[in-house]
Amino acid sequence: IARKFNSTYGEAFTIPEAMLDSDIVMIRGRDGRKMSKSYGNHISPDHTEEEIYERVKSFVTDRKKLSDEGDPYECPVFDLHRAFNRDGEVEVARACRNATSKCYDCKTGELPDLIADSYSDYRTRKAEISDGFVLDVLREGNIKAREVTSEKMDQVRKFMLMDYLK
């Protein structure tokens, strides 16, 4: 939208730059598709530790037999290790490739605890926040946004030759 406006009326908006980290991976859900709340295959910070454990345990892995060597990059559970178990990621990949650990162990070991621990600050903070606090933050943000956007909207109206009412 900003690019189209700028090309039509003039340089009013800054074009945002992508800020992608090459280390970020798409995390697949328990069915192998992209993890998504709409697919119902996600792990949410709102889930309890028990729910996280059950969801991780239900992930589909890539090996057919326990003796088969695995490919960690084909396994959605390894996506979770890459996101939540950075210290143990290399060892998990090695054990998968060598078939020295069972997929079930990979899912039920420390991984669910690591995920739950990473979400614990969120859950604690969420419990502390009241509805009144949220409304106060929204009001303050609204006031600040109006100050910033009123100047920008004046500039936009000028570019579009719609500032004749002043």
Residue ranges and their predicted role:
Residues 2-166:
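Conserved nucleotide- and phosphate/pyrophosphate-binding catalytic cores
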